[in-house]
C-alpha cells in the first residue's frame, strides 16, 4: 500500500477496522480479484498516542468480484466504499464510448475479514451529471435505510443544478435530493453523525483546468488559509448537513490543510479517502499523487 500504484480511493469503518479501498484491488497482482485492506482501530490509536513506534501493518482482505471488471464497459476502478453492518456498498467509475458513467454495487464482508464478496448481479447505474472526463460519484453515505451518492464536481459552471442520488439497500433507485454548489472536487465523505452532519474532502488540482474558476464562494467568505499559493492547489474539509429534503453546507469555516507549497510544485496531494476518528479528528488517505499518505488531522480547537 505504500506504493503510489495502490491508488487508495476510499476509506470506511467496518466495526473496529478501517477499510482501505484501492481503486484497482488487484493492483499487486496477488491473484483472484485482489484485496482491500484493514487496519485495526487499536493500532491506529496506539500509533497516534506514541505507544507504538513500528509501521502500521494492513491486513489484506481478499476481494471477490468474479468477472465484474470485465462486464463494466470502460472500467476505471472503484471510487467509494461504505458499510451498513456487514453489507458493503461500493461505487465504480467507467469511461465508456458514451461518456463517463458511475455504478453502485453491494456485497458482504465476512466478520473474520476472510473476504469481501460482491454480488455482481446488483450492479446499478448512477445517472451522470456532467460531460467532464474522469468524473463520477466519489462519495457514498449510508442514511438509515437509504444510500446517498455524491457527484465529484458541483461547481456553478460545470454542474449548475447538482443532485445527490438515493437508493435503497437493495440498490433500487429512490429519487434525488438537492446538493449545494461547491467549487472543485468532492472526493470522499465521512459517515453521518447523530445530527445528520458529515465532512467531505474538497480538493483542487491546478492541472484540472475545467474546474478552474474566478469565484470560490467558500474562500470569499472564510479565506483560503495561510499556506495557499495563488493559482495553486486547494485542500480543505467542508462540513455538510443531510436531511431527507436535501444536503446543505453548514455555516462554519472549512478546515484548511497545510499545503506543501513548492515541495510539490504547488500541485497539492490527491486526497481521496476520509473518516472520523473517535472524536479526535480525521484520517485521510491519498490516491496516487504524490504517494500513499495516511494522515491525521485533529478536530479544530473548541469542537
Model-derived segments and spans:
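Sequence/structural signature of beta-propeller domains
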Residues: 1-303
Amino acid at each position: 500500500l505504500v506504493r503510489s500504484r495502490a491508488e487508495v480511493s476510499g476509506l470506511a469503518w467496518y466495526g473496529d477496522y478501517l477499510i482501505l479501498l484501492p481503486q484497482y484491488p488487484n493492483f499487486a497482482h496477488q491473484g483472484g480479484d485482489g484485496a482491500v485492506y484493514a487496519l485495526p482501530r487499536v493500532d491506529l490509536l496506539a500509533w497516534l498516542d506514541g505507544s507504538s513506534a513500528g509501521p502500521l501493518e494492513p491486513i489484506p482482505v481478499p476481494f471477490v468480484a468474479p468477472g465484474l471488471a470485465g462486464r463494466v464497459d470502460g472500467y476505471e476502478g472503484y471510487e467509494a466504499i461504505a458499510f451498513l453492518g456487514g453489507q458493503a456498498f461500493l461505487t465504480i467509475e467507467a469511461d465508456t464510448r458514451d461518456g463517463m458513467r458511475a455504478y453502485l454495487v453491494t456485497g458482504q464482508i465476512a466478520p473474520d475479514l476472510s473476504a469481501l464478496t460482491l454480488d455482481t448481479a446488483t450492479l446499478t447505474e448512477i445517472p451522470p451529471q456532467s460531460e467532464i472526463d474522469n468524473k463520477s460519484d466519489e462519495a457514498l453515505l449510508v442514511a438509515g435505510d437509504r444510500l446517498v451518492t455524491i457527484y465529484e464536481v458541483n461547481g456553478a459552471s460545470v454542474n449548475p443544478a447538482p443532485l445527490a442520488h438515493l437508493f435503497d439497500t437493495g440498490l433500487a433507485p429512490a429519487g434525488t435530493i438537492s446538493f449545494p454548489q461547491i467549487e472543485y472536487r468532492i472526493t470522499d465523505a465521512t459517515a453521518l453523525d447523530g445530527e445528520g452532519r458529515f465532512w467531505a474532502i474538497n480538493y483542487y488540482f491546478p492541472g484540472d483546468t475545467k474546474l478552474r474558476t474566478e469565484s470560490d464562494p467558500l474562500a470569499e467568505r472564510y479565506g483560503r488559509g495561510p499556506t495557499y499559493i495563488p493559482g495553486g492547489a486547494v485542500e480543505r474539509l467542508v462540513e455538510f448537513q443531510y436531511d431527507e429534503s436535501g444536503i446543505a453546507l453548514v455555516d462554519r469555516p472549512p478546515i484548511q490543510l497545510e499545503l506543501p507549497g513548492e515541495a510539490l510544485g504547488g500541485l497539492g496531494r490527491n486526497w481521496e479517502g476520509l473518516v472520523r476518528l473517535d472524536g479526535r479528528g480525521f484520517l485521510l488517505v491519498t490516491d496516487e499523487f504524490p504517494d500513499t499518505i495516511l494522515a491525521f488531522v485533529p478536530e479544530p480547537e473548541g469542537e
